[in-house]
Structure formats: structure tokens, C-alpha cells
Amino acid sequence: MLSNHKTLYVALLILLGSFTLRFLHLGDIPGPTFDEVFYPRYGFNYLTGENFYYVHPPLANYLYAASIWIYNQLPWIDITAIDTLQFEQLNPLSYRWLNALLGSLLCPLAYFFAYAIWKNNNFALIVSFFVAIDGSLLVDSRFALANIYIVFFGLSALLCAAKSQSADVNPRYWLLSSGVLLGLVVSVKWNGL
């Protein structure tokens, strides 16, 4: 796994490309667009203490709330109090950056999963490359859509399950991790079932 320098350089190049595709001009699209009028808004409602009804489990909304809060704590962000803002006044970058980060991290995750199954560096690099350039994953990573959390936690769960089959030490820890991650998948949206 990443045994030689050439493989490591190619993997890092794919990761750099993935970050570039997801973060370049991330805040340029004025928001909220598409389903961003729902998911990040509900996260914002958690921050402001506003009551609302939501049909899905709350993890994605908690993550959006954390994303907005962390972004607004940055020293170069000049904001008086988040309670005084309306959702439409938020910088779209505040609720999109976490999706872009997790979408970028899908590439090494896909590499490690493919390597855990097939034990072939070249195949794992191809899988990682296709995850980096996949159009659907790019859209889900660049907009505040909850689907990227399902994919990220789901692929992490599969990786842990694959590791449990080849673990030299006690595989129960890998299986327990896989179960916790599957619980996170279900706590994002019901279609995670």
C-alpha cells in the first residue's frame, strides 16, 4: 500500500486534483441553491435556536451547524453575532466547505478500500482517480447536500468491514467501527438504510 515513491506521488497528485476541483471558486456560486435552501438552513436554525420540523435524522444538520459556526469563528470573518443574521446573509462558503473537504477525502478513502479488497496499487489509484473526477460526487461535494455524508460514512464503514477480514489483531474493533459508521449513515438521511 503506497509502497513506492511513484505510487505515493500519483496518489498525492490525485488528492491535490480532488481538492482543487472541489474548493476552486467554491463560494462563487451565489447561495443558497438547490437543496441548500433546506439542509444548511436547518443547521443554521440549530445555531439560532429556532424551532422547526425536519423529516430526516439530524446528523447532517448538526454538521452544517458546526460548519457554519467554525467558519464564522475564523479571525478574518467579520461578523457581530450569528443570531442577528438571516440565513440568506451567510456566505455560501460557510456551509459548503465541509462537504468539499469530505468529498476530497473520499479519494484516499476509495484508494484504501480498493487496496484492502484487491491488494493492487494500480487498481486502487484508478479507483481513486475516478472518485476524484466523478461528476455526481463533484456536485455533491461543491454544494451543501447531505448525500456526501452518506457516501463518506458508508465508504468508511465498508473500509472498516474489509479491514476486519484481514486484521492481524482483533477484528472486533474494525467491525465495531464499521457498525458505528453505519449508524452515522442512517443518522444522516433515511435513505441511508
Located regions from the model:
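Membrane-interface transmembrane helices that cradle and orient dolichyl/undecaprenyl
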Residues: M1, A116-W118, A157-L175, V185
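Transmembrane signal-anchor helices characteristic of membrane glycosylation enzymes that use polyprenol
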Residues: K6-E36, T48, L184-V185
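Interfacial juxtamembrane loops and adjacent helix segments
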Residues: F52-A100
